[in-house]
């Protein structure tokens, strides 16, 4: 008489939940209908879409060769660096103002009646694009880089504040409880237990936001908020495509350079912070081992 072993028994494949197929087809149908409704609302001309590749190719042919000399004479290089300055000032504004607010928004270091309005403040700022903020600031500061810097800085408060809040909420609560048990005040707990754990990550977020702000500052120039965008728009309006291509190429080179340098710095900051934590743990382990060895002698 043969006895079935565990290897002879093949488990049955579980059946999908009843109604899963109909639900998926229903979701797909809703998405398709939403896409068709969106296209109809845009009043898209399909004949124009068919001609678009040929027209785009004609414009690209007019952009070659780029007129770097004419662009340099008009000071476009200075406008590119002005975009970088706008992004840097905006990032500083966002970093300085978002950091203290992030401590008030974190649920592990702040009471609910404090963190709820701060979180809503972050959400409200992030809901307003930089372009709208720049339009608001232009009547106040006038045309120029200050409107762009303020718009980027205010918008960065919401994003950097959210990222910093999430970093604070993910820390180890042990040091906080230890300082609290010894009678340490809230400020002391933040200074000695929270900041050492999150500053490396928050600094990397600042650099990442700077990369985003460099690209945003180039766009803000198109509405007169400083930067290289105004130079690009003027060339496109007058159909000076060789000069426009030169501005685009220079802008892309500067942005890629900043992205590469910032990514390397962020990686070194994060790896260095992990290495410091690992070395401190090894030091504590070694001290424990040597203490045990001394006690056994």
Regions found by a protein language model. Give the residues of each.
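Transmembrane-helix boundary motif in ABC transporter permease subunits
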Residues: 89-122
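Glycine-rich helix-loop "coupling/hinge" segments at transmembrane-helix boundaries
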Residues: 139, 214-251, 270-278
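Short amphipathic alpha-helical coupling elements at transmembrane boundaries
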Residues: 55-65, 78, 82, 116-126, ...
């Amino acid at each position: 008489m043969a006895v079935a072993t565990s290897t002879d028994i093949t488990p049955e494949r579980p059946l999908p939940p009843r109604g899963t197929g109909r639900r998926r087809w229903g979701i797909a149908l809703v998405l398709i209908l939403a896409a068709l409704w969106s296209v109809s609302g845009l009043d898209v001309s399909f004949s124009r879409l068919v001609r678009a590749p040929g027209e785009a190719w004609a414009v690209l042919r007019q952009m070659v060769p780029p007129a770097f000399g004419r662009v340099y004479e008009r000071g476009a290089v200075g406008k590119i660096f002005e975009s970088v300055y706008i992004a840097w000032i905006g990032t500083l504004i966002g970093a300085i103002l978002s950091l203290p607010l992030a401590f008030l928004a974190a649920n592990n270091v702040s009471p609910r009646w404090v963190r709820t309005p701060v979180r809503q403040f972050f959400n409200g700022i992030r809901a307003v694009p930089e372009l709208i903020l720049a339009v608001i600031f232009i009547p106040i500061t006038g045309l120029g880089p200050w409107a762009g810097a303020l718009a980027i800085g205010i918008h960065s408060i919401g994003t950097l504040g959210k990222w910093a809040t999430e970093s604070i909420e993910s820390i180890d609560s042990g040091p906080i409880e230890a300082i609290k048990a010894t009678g340490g005040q809230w400020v002391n707990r933040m200074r000695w237990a929270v900041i050492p754990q999150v500053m490396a990550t928050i600094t990397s977020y600042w650099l990442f936001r700077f990369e985003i702000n460099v690209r945003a500052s180039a766009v803000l120039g198109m509405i007169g908020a400083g930067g290289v965008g105004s130079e690009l728009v003027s060339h496109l309006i007058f159909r000076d495509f060789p000069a426009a291509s030169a501005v685009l190429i220079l802008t892309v080179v500067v942005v890629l350079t900043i992205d590469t340098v910032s990514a390397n710095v962020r990686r070194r900051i994060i790896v260095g912070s992990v290495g410091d934590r690992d070395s401190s743990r090894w030091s504590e382990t070694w001290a424990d081992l040597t203490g045990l060895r001394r006690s056994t002698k």
